[in-house]
Amino acid sequence: MEAEESEKAATEQEPLEGTEQTLDAEEEQEESEEAACGSKKRVVPGIVYLGHIPPRFRPLHVRNLLSAYGEVGRVFFQAEDRFVRRKKKAAAAAGGKKRSYTKDYTEGWVEFRDKRIAKRVAASLHNTPMGARRRSPFRYDLWNLKYLHRFTWSHLSEHLAFERQVRRQRLRAEVAQAKRETDFYLQSVERGQRFLAADGDPARPDGSWTFAQRPTEQELRARKAARPGGRERARLATAQDKARSNKGLLARIFGAPPPSESMEGPSLVRDS
């Protein structure tokens, strides 16, 4: 009897263990599916580019206007060039305007927490009025929005760092060029002052200057002849010059063709 009861207990435990294993497997599968769904639903930020920014339009304005469509993250506006800023400041100072000069921006980038909202905003608000109210100062300005596909904020940071580095290198090159021009001018002035001082020097009564000129052909031949083994070459060169001059003189006297033509004539006759 005891053996039969033990066999029954063993047979009852086996299906229980099988059901527990199946439940564990189902729970693990559900957890993996939830993790996969969570990874699919992960929010990816998107960036919208602003190609036109009206005067006196600030990041706070764009944040307030676009926050109605979705959560806005980081906002960056590119300031106008320093040269343009100086010209505007000078014009404002010359015109005697009551309002002081305010810095303006040329372009901007807005980050949305969800790229789907960024796409929707760029597609729906493009070429529409910025201000909805009649008294809004930006009512007659239009949105110029473009969604940047696969563009992240790190790309923008790298791009801005690259532009900053290029600007610094250009500034260094301009400063170096200006320094070279200034040094050359100062050297020229000092040289002229030395010349003027030397003109009134009593050690030079004539006040004449001597300048080194390039050696002539005769001087070069004389130098070559002075070298070991150069006399023979000089003699050969002079002999060749004399022969050429004699041939040219005979050709002028007798009306004969030059040596090159006289050599080509018989060859043509033979060929014919």
Curated annotation (Swiss-Prot):
Residue span, RRM domain: 46-142
Biased composition (Acidic residues): 23-34
Keyword list, A-Z: Acetylation, Coiled coil, DNA-binding, Nucleus, RNA-binding, Transcription, Transcription regulation
Modification N-acetylmethionine, positions: M1
Coiled coil: 161-191
GO molecular function: DNA binding; RNA binding; transcription coactivator activity
Region named Disordered: 1-38, 198-272
Major place of residence: nucleus
Positions with biased composition (Basic and acidic residues): 1-11
Protein's UniProt keywords contain Flavoprotein: no
Cellular component, GO annotation: nucleolus; nucleus; transcription regulator complex
InterPro entries: ABT1/Esf2, ABT1/ESF2_RRM, Nucleotide-bd_a/b_plait_sf, RBD_domain_sf
Localisation: Nucleus; Nucleus, Nucleolus
Bridged cysteine pairs (disulfide): none
One example of a Gene Ontology biological process annotation: endonucleolytic cleavage to generate mature 5'-end of SSU-rRNA from (SSU-rRNA, 5.8S rRNA, LSU-rRNA)
Assembly and binders: Interacts with ESF1/ABTAP. Interacts with IGHMBP2.
Entry's family note: Belongs to the ESF2/ABP1 family.
Function field: Could be a novel TATA-binding protein (TBP) which can function as a basal transcription activator. Can act as a regulator of basal transcription for class II genes.
Protein name: Activator of basal transcription 1
